[in-house]
């Protein structure tokens, strides 16, 4: 400690390790991800997903090279950002002539979704390895779900009751929560690298 600093003075918060690069993928990982993927079709796909699976031994090296070029260059290809948007009525009783009654469902190409999966796995591994997930978070964490939240909540209530304590529960549900966030703020956080800036730029 410095002359003016007590040994017991509060220390500055620990800065989490930065995610500066994305580890390249390989043929084995791509093969596994492709075979595990749902056989869904998108109008933007040049060939059916089922055919990609059947020909994975031939296509895996090509797909691996394309995704690795995207990762190494820090650029999410513009063609991967294109999607087929289908308006879906939120509730049966809503006004069908009102645009706000619909939820836009975007269907991306198979290669785009595959690239997202590769990046997601690396980001999740980084967050997990460095203990960056919130202690009470259940979303986007392997082996966690809404059931995890309910079990934790139930356990807390039971413990409080056993101690004759009063329990108050406040629930907050934000409509279109992600859309209310300024994405430019998110992608400028220290943990986010240029790849994610490229991902959110000019999404169609």
Features from the language model and the residues they span:
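Residues immediately flanking
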Residues: 90-91, 111, 121, 172-174
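Short glycine-centered helix-capping/turn motifs at secondary-structure transition points
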Residues: 74, 130-131, 164
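Catalytic-core region of right-hand nucleic acid polymerases
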Residues: 68, 177-204
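Surface-exposed loop/turn segments and immediately adjacent short secondary-structure elements
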Residues: 1-100, 106-114
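Alpha-helical recognition domains of nuclear gene-regulatory proteins
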Residues: 33, 50-51, 66, 70, ...
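Conserved short loop/turn motifs at secondary-structure junctions
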Residues: 46-55, 137-142, 171-177
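Conserved catalytic palm subdomain of right-hand nucleotidyl-transferase polymerases, strongest
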Residues: 38-47, 98-107, 149-188
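Electropositive, glycine- and tryptophan-enriched low-complexity nucleic-acid-binding patches
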Residues: 116, 124-140
């Amino acid at each position: 400690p410095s002359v003016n600093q007590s040994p017991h003075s509060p220390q500055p918060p620990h800065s989490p390790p930065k995610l500066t690069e994305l580890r390249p993928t390989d043929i084995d990982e791509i093969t596994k991800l492709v075979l595990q993927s749902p056989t869904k079709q998108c109008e933007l796909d040049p060939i059916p997903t089922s055919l990609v699976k059947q020909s994975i031994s031939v296509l895996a090296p090509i797909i691996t090279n394309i995704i690795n070029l995207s990762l190494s260059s820090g650029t999410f290809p513009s063609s991967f950002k294109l999607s087929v948007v289908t308006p879906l009525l939120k509730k049966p009783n809503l006004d069908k002539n009102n645009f706000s009654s619909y939820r836009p469902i975007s269907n991306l190409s198979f290669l785009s979704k595959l690239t997202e999966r590769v990046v997601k796995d690396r980001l999740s591994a980084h967050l997990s390895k460095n203990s960056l997930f919130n202690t009470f978070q259940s979303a986007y964490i392997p082996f966690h779900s809404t059931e995890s939240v309910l079990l934790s909540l139930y356990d807390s209530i039971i413990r409080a009751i056993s101690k004759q304590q009063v329990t108050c529960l406040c629930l907050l549900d934000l409509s279109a929560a992600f859309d209310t966030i300024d994405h430019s703020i998110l992608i400028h956080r220290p943990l986010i690298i240029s790849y994610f800036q490229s991902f959110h730029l000019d999404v169609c």
